[in-house]
Amino acid sequence: MSTPTVKLNSGYEMPLVGFGLWKVNNDTCADQVYEAIKAGYRLFDGACDYGNEVECGQGVARAIKEGIVKREDLFIVSKLWNSFHDSERVEPICRKQLADWGVDYFDLYIVHFPIALKYVDPAVRYPPGWMSENDKLEFSNTPIHETWAAMEKLVDLKLARSIGVSNFSAQLLMDLLRYARVRPSTLQIEHHPYLTQKRLVDYAQKEGLAVTAYSSFGPLSFLELNLKDAHETPLLFEHPAITAIAEKHGKTPAQVLLRWATQRKVAVIPKSNNPTRLAQNLDVTSFNLEASEIESISALDRNLRFNDPLAITNFVSSLCAQYGFYAPIF
């Protein structure tokens, strides 16, 4: 089974449906990547912060060794973590991540957050997470334009074919596009019916960036993180507006949610270790929703963001003590 692609402004084709690697356990990660490749997945969305890139690479290596795919058949994505925004840190950490994956280049390398944190030596702690060695949130003074110049050099060195950003606002994109020598190819954001971010999506696509949605199922991804909003928000899988559309089309609620995105040219990166759901998630471009159905799903928007790292990691209180105010990321 294959999936349609979207052409990036770098000239490369990116699959509209991929496999997300956030919260994939190290013990099962290699097997999950391998099975996903066998099922037809070609895009794998990883990151330094996920802490499983070595295992991801093992799954890829096994599939290549068995002749299931060639490296050029895959679209491998990784991300630059906040602790490595200093311009001199970007290339070395990218090379480390490539070595962890066991590949020579990333198809797409993304700035994970528009936040520069104090450098943490990978030999001391890897992945670094949000906190520095003294268990505090410590920022670096490195501006985005310096980090982006170092990202552009990765393209020059052929370490990354395309580069992009994640969790950027429209204002940050506007600024970045004023000076970028190599334009960002993609914007990855939290995007689901409870957080449609329509104006941001429209702006990014108008500027020629492909948009990728993470957490397409809304609160479901965050239940295990003990996030209050996730537990108090109705699951999209059970929402009457979603289940009615799913029943009409003979599809699962998950497929409807993913199709709501892909039909608007927004890429998705769900994950599953269930073979049936793996196939179902990949098969979300073979049917079309009616315009009225897309509108009714979009009308569920609450501007409700679940991926607020400050809330998830429970260090709001330490920030308040340190700075005397709440330091929001979004």
Curated annotation (Swiss-Prot):
Protein name: Probable NAD(P)H-dependent D-xylose reductase xyl1
Purpose of the protein: Catalyzes the initial reaction in the xylose utilization pathway by reducing D-xylose into xylitol. Xylose is a major component of hemicelluloses such as xylan. Most fungi utilize D-xylose via three enzymatic reactions, xylose reductase (XR), xylitol dehydrogenase (XDH), and xylulokinase, to form xylulose 5-phosphate, which enters pentose phosphate pathway.
Record-stated family: Belongs to the aldo/keto reductase family.
Pfam families the UniProt entry points to: Aldo_ket_red (PF00248)
Transcription among keywords: no
Pathway: Carbohydrate metabolism; D-xylose degradation
Source organism of the structure: Aspergillus clavatus (strain ATCC 1007 / CBS 513.65 / DSM 816 / NCTC 3887 / NRRL 1 / QM 1276 / 107)
Lineage, opening ranks: Eukaryota, Fungi, Dikarya, Ascomycota, Pezizomycotina
Site (Lowers pKa of active site Tyr) location in chain: K79
Binding of substrate, residues: H112
GO molecular function, one term: D-xylose reductase (NADPH) activity
UniProt EC number: 1.1.1.307
Signal peptide feature range: none
